[in-house]
Amino acid sequence: MAALQSAPDSPATQLEPAEDGSECDADPEEEEEEEQQEEEDEEEEEEVVVEEVATPVQEVAEVEVEANSADNGGGDDDDDGGGGDDDVEEVLAEEQTLSLGTQERHSNGGHAKAPVLQGKALQTSRVSPTTQDEDVEEEEEEEDEEHFLTQGLVTFEDVAVYFSLEEWERLGVDQRDLYREVMQENYGILVSLGYPIPKPDLIFHLEQGEEPWVEDGPHPEEGDVVTGVYTGAWFWNDDIEDHEEEDDEDFLAEVAEEENEPPGLWSAAYGVGDVPGTWGPDDSDSVQTPEGWGPNPGSLGILAEEVEAKHFLSGREPGENFLVPWAFPAVAVPIGCPETTCDVCGKVFPHRSRLAKHQRYHAAVKPFGCDECGKGFVYRSHLAIHQRTHTGEKPFPCPDCGKRFVYKSHLVTHRRIHTGERPYRCVFCGAGFGRRSYLVTHQRTHTGERPYPCLHCGRSFSQSSALARHQAVHTADRPHCCPDCGQAFRLRADFQRHRRSGGCTEPSSGDGARMAPHEVGMAPNEVEMAVAAVATVEPEELEAAPAETEEPEAGVADGDTEAEARQDEQVVVAPAAEATVPDSKKDPEPDRRFREMGNGLAEGEGPSSHPFGFHFPMHPKSWLHPDGFPILGFPEFSERLQADGRHLPGPLGSPLSLQGMGLACDPFRSVGPGAGVDGGLRAFPPAVRSLLSEPAPAALAEEESPWICSDCGKTFGRRAALAKHQRYHAGERPHRCADCGKSFVYGSHLARHRRTHTGERPFPCPECGARFARGSHLAAHVRGHTGEKPFVCGVCGAGFSRRAHLTAHGRAHTGERPYACAECGRRFGQSAALTRHQWAHAEEKPHRCPDCGKGFGHSSDFKRHRRTHTGEKPFRCADCGRGFAQRSNLAKHRRGHTGERPFPCPECGKRFSQRSVLVTHQRTHTGERPYLCSNCGRRFSQSSHLLTHMKTHRGPGSAPAHTSSTKAQAPAKATPPLPPPGSGSGTLLEFAGGTSFGSDPAAFAGPSGSYEESIL
């Protein structure tokens, strides 16, 4: 317990000086009594408060003294720390009881009899207040109830205990496990009681299996980022899912770094998000500071969770300061240094000058404005950082590849691509990631979480970017327009990529045919058909004067319901024959896109405030007729028209008249070079319009526009994937290994390659514990345990656990030998066989046998050869104990015990355990007899039969017979005389493949002349 008692920042130590009331935080009731009561009543009330606070502290001290005395007098058995677990558990329980009871007492308006979360120590030792004190408290309870409710929120910090590194190292393994268990249990209790507490960093790191110690050191200065504290520390807002806001987040991080301010404060001050005065989900991170140096830890997080996406200024005047004191109801202003405490957010500063500078954020004073965009900033340094976005300055270069970045955080993240560093590990599969946000997104594949639902169709997605791409199916809006070439983009990321590429082309002026989609920056197989639900147009109305219009209700999407569709039919619009296309292509506000339609509409009005449309993937050749307007040409919709009984006035692709058509004009998305009606107008028949008001088919909603590689024809769902793929064809390999210099196309390939240098094998087998560097290798290995062979040969039915093995096996049927030797031209079916063969041509054979002098180019071949001299047989059968020199021979032998017969005869179906036995058996069907007796010319199908037959030519006392055997297709060779029987020199057998001597019946020379060992 020395570690707990000696901790300088432990809760018990911090509460000890409160016994005399000298440093105890004054009860909030004292502030009210200074204005309402006399000085005597104030002193009396203060004594009661001090007495109530000091009594629990005395109990904690008494409990610790009793625990220490029990430890000292408990006998020799406790000297070795055997009772450390009980001490840690007791102190943690007391701390939890004290903190929870005190907080609950405050949350009940200061009532002395609040029963919830009261510990036994508080119940037995509480000094009962006098009747007069109870009356005073009851009178002020209603008055201060709201104030206490806001300041009495229980946070995890109130029941948490922290250790320094030195103290943590003193704890035993059991004590550390007990600490982890108690901390997680405390958090679970708070959550079960309904407190809106976000998960603290301490619990997160405990779940990750990391050490929870707190780094020693002096208190940081105001605003410093405390990187050594796992809980209660500021952290960078770099885990935002929406990467479109990444620039804003990095700017805030850079500002915080240069101004020595916590980034979370900048997020709150600037209101990261598109809606000013709204606390968005990006601000709900755990905004915490060390005690005494900012808001109550976790309080801002609680606030964000309670009022997430709710306006602070409901009913307020526009432009009024939204960061007012009532906007932070959960922040308690520290007592004791009010002259340096912010009365808005409760942050404490060491000097008044720092407080005055900080209050600029709340007062919205931004004296430094940007000349380019007019954006204001509190500090000049912030303006300098912001101006990099206009000047293009990138002061942070990568030392490896030279690429430059605007923000230092971008450089740090980019550097991980070169180093292969992946500091964030998945607890489920061990996969590593370079960003925490990537880890969070990846873990959703394990948990199945899909937090981003589509408001149109209800489909959910695990990533916000996937939702954004999906929503393009439901809307035709392209709010990001290029001022140079006029191309419009749905996503800001696509627009920024277009601007960086510098591929803008000015549209040519003059009349001309409408451009194809691929000529205006659209996907080659994507056609955008935007329809605004307006009234039909009669021919005589085309030349009529503009008429007054009735605009549909703003804010309602057209075509959502049948009633709205009927309402749209009643809208009267008299468009002119020509629509004026503005000179400036700059995209105005989304709700004022149709103001220059040229059809008599008033300024700011339009056919609809929410145009709808869909994207239909189709071949570019059928997307438009050269003499008419683009109309629906997707075959699937043609079938739908026929099924629904709706007919177009003409065949698909034919010229279309404006009579009876609905018109829609968006001049800021006009793609044709000519002016007039074609400059942004789209015409569709009513039948098509009613179809488009219905939800898109699931197949169309799911389908992505493929991007085709012009080199190999491979298709991709995204342009970024195609760009990465084209690196293969271009030979670009930007990711280089620092150890061996090998280059890779993808950063993930480099990270996987790095494991060959580090020896890391993050994928363990759950069956045998073997570890692998790749997940695919582990999957193939697991099939060895399960016996699964999903890759089956279509010719012979043989199964394989790996696709590569099936591919190599298939070449045995086709006779393909794609690997040729450059030296001799010999071809092989496998690359490994070619590699082994090439050692025969290599002059250098570093592995030479000391017994026979034979050289080998590969160490494995040399080791296998050495076993012929040493007689070593390292592979032993677990059933019979027989040893083998090669693993393959052991595998063949094992089939005799297991009964496995993987080689079936295609003629009769009989199965065999060895391929050589199958080959011998097949001769009974083919009639082949390759073994010839040179004496009588008789043939045999097996060499053993020939050996038995040769004994008939040698009678007792007769001269040795000259015998030989050959294959039928090869002539017999002359053989020397046989040695006399019993000479021990063996029997000479001659084959087309060579000669072999053998006295052991278990050894024989096969038809190929190679030596074979009997396995069974």
Swiss-Prot record:
Residues 583-596 have a biased composition (Basic and acidic residues). InterPro entries: KRAB, KRAB_dom_sf, Znf_C2H2_sf, Znf_C2H2_type. Its main location: nucleus. The gene is Znf316. Residues 121-131 have a biased composition (Polar residues). It comes from Mus musculus. This is Zinc finger protein 316. Residues 154-225 form the KRAB domain. It is found in: Nucleus. GO terms for biological process: regulation of DNA-templated transcription. Gene3D superfamilies: 6.10.140.140, Classic Zinc Finger (3.30.160.60). May be involved in transcriptional regulation.
